């Protein structure tokens, strides 16, 4: 009898963190669990309901929403419920505010005739582990980061390395227990970790959350063993159990790849249809990052000088960004490159763009979702990590030889001539090792999510585990 039949009816609570890069992949995992006959309740605050609406429509009998209001926090302006709308200094406040859902969520559980038997929640919601323990159920940590990055995050909070010279931002922090012994200058470590203050209530709450992640029943990762085998094995060794599930790449189901992009999706894809295979550079720095005007100028100059075809996804700057000289596309640039490139403001159908045969190179900030989407689509990456886990992700890409370094850091301004040369050479040089390697990993990614693939096997093992 198939595992999915055995487990029909098991009720799971899924709790995503309200940030685009965190929510979408956990919702893609939720879809995979739903088609395996699990009953799922997704917890969101009211203003995040539209993000899960397509999933609710696709699974009307097995997936439902639990709406709980976001508890107030002095650092979060009224009406804001998603990280993308937060002031720059309020990221940790969202983690703390969501922690105040402990009692309302416990009350909801106790009033259910058929309460969930397990919780799957984002690694920024570590407090749900304590709730699960109180309720006598299992909590699984969902990591929107890969296995190497998660190894670094767990190592930071478990061992708490410190600088010898507290004034030296470049001091190297070493991770000798992690395979290949990565090391990073202090400034490249997680900003959440770097801002930890011993004894500060919010800092201690966040630290406790990550330690609770380590203590949780299992870890679910958007990666696949063929890409990160050594780091998946390391996590199992560090955690002392094998409940680490590499279930990626988690991508939107079927033809949903363009639906996330809004009204501009069809225009972009139609334009790409006019381009030859592997002739287009895609430029995107994620849903949160806004470049300085100086960086915008250099990227624009690099694209212009290279004479390559391109799609450049630009996050719409706020009034505050504009006042601080962030996010401006150089005047006249779009006219000068008309017909050769597109500048798209706002959200774009990234999976569909990367999957298009015309796209051959991706200038990326190395956010993990972007990495997984590019690997799956067989697109060579030019790396410009800027924050958080992006430096670990870039390390992995260089280690596996599927990425070429451009620069690193959110303050650096690269040379436009060097950038132009990278754009043109990375598209034209079919013999380079990185292109061969990305082709091999794309094949592995496809096999991982195919019949009898490693990630499908891990999904089935997870479904089986959820219902024990």
Swiss-Prot record:
UDP-alpha-D-glucose binds at residues 287, 347-348, 365-373, 387-390. InterPro entries: UDP_glucos_trans. Signal peptide: none annotated. One of its GO terms (molecular function) is UDP-glucosyltransferase activity. May glycosylate diterpenes or flavonols in leaves. Belongs to the UDP-glycosyltransferase family. This is UDP-glycosyltransferase 89B2. The gene is UGT89B2.
């Amino acid at each position: 009898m198939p595992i999915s039949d055995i487990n029909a009816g098991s009720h799971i609570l899924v709790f995503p963190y309200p940030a685009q890069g965190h929510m979408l992949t956990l919702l893609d995992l939720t879809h995979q669990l739903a088609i395996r006959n699990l009953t799922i309740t997704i917890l969101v605050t009211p203003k995040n309901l539209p993000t899960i609406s397509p999933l609710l429509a696709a699974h009307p009998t097995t997936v439902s929403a639990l709406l709980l209001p976001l508890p107030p926090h002095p650092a979060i302006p009224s009406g804001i419920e998603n990280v993308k709308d937060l002031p720059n200094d309020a990221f940790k406040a969202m983690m703390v505010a969501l922690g105040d859902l402990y009692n309302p969520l416990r009350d909801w559980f106790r009033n259910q005739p058929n309460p969930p038997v397990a919780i799957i929640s984002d690694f920024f919601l570590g407090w749900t582990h304590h709730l699960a323990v109180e309720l006598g159920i299992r909590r699984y940590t969902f990591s929107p980061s890969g296995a190497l990055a998660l190894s670094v995050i767990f190592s930071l909070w478990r061992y708490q390395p410190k600088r010898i010279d507290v004034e030296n931002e470049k001091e190297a922090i070493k991770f000798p227990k992690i395979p290949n012994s990565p090391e990073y200058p202090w400034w490249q470590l997680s900003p959440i970790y770097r801002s930890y203050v011993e004894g500060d209530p919010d800092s201690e709450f966040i630290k406790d959350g990550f330690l609770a992640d380590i203590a949780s029943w299992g870890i679910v990762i958007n990666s696949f063993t063929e890409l990160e085998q050594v780091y998946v094995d390391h996590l199992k060794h560090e955690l002392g159990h094998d409940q680490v599930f590499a279930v990626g790449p988690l991508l939107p189901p079927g033809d949903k790849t363009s639906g996330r992009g809004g009204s501009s999706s069809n225009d972009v894809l139609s334009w790409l249809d006019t381009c030859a295979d592997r002739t287009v550079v895609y430029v995107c720095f994620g849903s949160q990052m806004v470049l300085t005007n100086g960086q915008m100028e250099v990227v624009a100059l690099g694209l212009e000088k290279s004479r390559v075809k391109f799609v450049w996804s630009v996050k719409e700057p706020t009034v505050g960004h504009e006042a601080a000289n962030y996010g401006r596309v150089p005047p006249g640039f779009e006219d000068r490159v008309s017909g050769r490139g597109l500048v798209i403001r706002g959200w774009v159908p990234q999976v569909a763009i990367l999957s298009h045969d015309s796209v051959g190179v991706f200038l990326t900030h190395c956010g993990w979702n972007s990495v997984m989407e590019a690997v799956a689509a067989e697109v060579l990456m030019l790396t410009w990590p800027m924050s958080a886990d992006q430096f670990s992700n870039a390390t992995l890409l260089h280690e596996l030889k599927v990425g070429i370094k451009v620069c690193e850091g959110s303050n650096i301004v690269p040379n436009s001539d060097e950038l132009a040369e990278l754009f043109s050479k990375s598209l034209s040089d079919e013999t380079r090792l990185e292109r061969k390697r990305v082709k091999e990993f794309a094949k592995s990614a496809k096999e991982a999510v195919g019949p009898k693939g490693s990630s499908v096997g891990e999904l089935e093992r997870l479904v089986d585990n959820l219902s024990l």
